Amino acid sequence: MAGHSKWANIQHRKGRQDEKRGKIWTRIIREITVAARAGGGDVSANPRLRLAIDKAKAANMPADRIKYNIDKATGNAEGLTYEEIRYEGYGIGGAAIIVDTMTDNRVRTVAEVRHAFSKYGGNMGTEGSVAFQFKHVGQLIFAPGTSEDKVMEVALEAGAEDVVTDEDGAIEVLTAPGDFEAVKNALEAAGLTPDAADVTMRPDVTIDLAGEDAERMQKLLDVIEDLDDVQEVYHNAAL
């Protein structure tokens, strides 16, 4: 199955993350904190915590820093309590945007997200206004040049739902959220390490943007992603 290229978007985001390592760590620590408080500190029994730890390792967070934050989240020490809130809205050309946040102050967060939408050409919507245009899936993306046949064989055998080849040769493996970890482990055991892997919100249909519209949309997305309380931003724009 062929699909739109996601490779440029991944490289753009990786470049920005390299520039903002401290902020990335802060977001991952929030994820570890929420996951550990919700499901406990036993990594073997907490898939969400395992995913957060994988992100921490990918961001080169030291093991002792990871352990400290798990212990802090599951111990008796006082700490911030984070609330998970999702916002939805529209960007340039009517593109759909989902913004997932973790916050200790929802009044501050909604004001910042709303301001970003309005200042940079978007519109904040109501709950459910765009989420129906996305599916909750596991997603693993391999660089152009990876063996499509090998990825497909291993992924489908491990329980993947689909393997998509993008127009630039990047390969996208899609799974049910509950099968994500098993498929990822099988691929890595076969020597196939994805360049990006996460449980995400994937758009059913993409909207093509080019030229000035694409630049404005990218600016809006970058501004939203830079907000302190924002964890993830999903959209259906093909930039």
From Swiss-Prot:
Keyword DNA-binding recorded: yes
GO biological process: regulation of DNA-templated transcription
Coiled-coil residue spans: none
Localization: Cytoplasm
Gene3D superfamilies, per database record: 1.10.10.200, 3.30.70.980
Family stated for the protein in its record: Belongs to the TACO1 family.
Superkingdom to which the source organism belongs: Bacteria
Protein name: Probable transcriptional regulatory protein Aave_3203
GO molecular function: DNA binding
Matches recorded under Pfam families: TACO1_YebC_N, Transcrip_reg
Disulfide linkage: none
Record key words, sorted: Cytoplasm, DNA-binding, Transcription, Transcription regulation
Region (Disordered): 1-20
First and last residue of the signal peptide: none
